[in-house]
Amino acid sequence: MVRGAFGRLGRLVRHRLFQVLVSLAIGAALLWLAIARIDLAGLGAELAQVKPSWLVAAVALYWVALMLRSWRWRILLAPVRALSFGQVFHGLLVGYAANYLLPARLGELVRADLLGRRYAISRLSIVGTIVVERLFDVVVFIGFIFAGLAALHSTGDSRIGPILHLVELVAIGCVVLIVLLLVLIRLRHKPLPRPIAFLEKRLRALAAGLHLITGAQEVALLIAATAIVWTADTVTYWLLAYSLNAPLTLLQLFLVMGMSCLAALIPAAPGNIGALQYALVLAFQLLGLPGVTGFSLATLAQGCCIAGSTLVGGGLYLLAALGNARTRPKLAEPPVP
């Protein structure tokens, strides 16, 4: 039995190590491709001209956007369990830190597990709220890409085709997911066929997290919350670009946001290093702007915004882990003879 447990642990470690190595390789390859597309000598000069006041404003708004995301997630969690803003914000920061540090966006499961353990909530119900949250985000991402492509002077660029094909695949996946969620909601109070009856409890727990997409009023509330969240995110990127003396028009900004979202779908290195650089270099070059500015924008976003929230989220997780270790009951010591 012990040997079997160690065998399973070994396979899990190897699997996780393989995921990390693959993500690092993808990030390194994309970073190399991004560097190959720009004048690397001009990168230092580009970053040296950053306007500090605009950069500070961008970082401040980035944290406001994170708070707004916590507010939206709290709305989604309300039918499952009423939590304070601080409790939700803590979970979101830890989850986002894990997303930036771990491959395959495992941070979504980390925040579900954290809130589930801490507040005795079904993890599947929390996962259901995260699925809804990300579904609304994907719809925004698709809108960004299609609106942003309208900013291009030439639609005959051969680089546009692969982007559109990828967005189409994401859109198809989004539609399939919506259909599956609607089916799950309809079946949540009905007994399942005997072969899959063992899943009934789990599926109902998952469906509990989908409660807010069952009514028009609730969907309208989520649309409004998502619009506010993404407005803050979009203005953050505009401020970062402006700090680099690169004021973007609205349609140009939409393409940049869409490409940054596309980069987030790639299981690349921690902090999305490489993927974000390549995506924004490509976006700026499609817009007829210097690719080095896109590279600088990605680097600023990672170094000044993402790194800060990752450090805070990681610190909160470590503090919680240390607190749990201290409060864990100790085993009784045997009496001294």
Region annotations inferred by a language model:
Residues 109-114, 127-130, 140, 225, ...:
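Hydrophobic alpha-helical membrane segments of integral membrane proteins
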Residues 1-93, 151, 155-265, 293, ...:
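Predominantly cytoplasmic-facing regulatory/coupling regions of multi-pass membrane proteins
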Residues 94, 98-102, 127-149, 296-312:
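Membrane-embedded alpha-helical segments of transport systems
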Residues 89-120:
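Extended non-transmembrane interhelical loops and adjacent amphipathic helices
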Residues 245-251, 273, 279-299:
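Extracellular/periplasmic helix-loop-helix junctions in multi-pass membrane proteins
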Residues 86-90, 108-110, 121-134, 289-300:
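Membrane-interface alpha-helices at helix entry/exit sites of multi-pass transporters
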Residues 106-116, 147, 270-286:
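Re-entrant/interfacial helical elements at transmembrane boundaries that shape
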Residues 95-103, 257-277:
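Transmembrane alpha-helix interface/packing and boundary motifs in multi-pass membrane proteins
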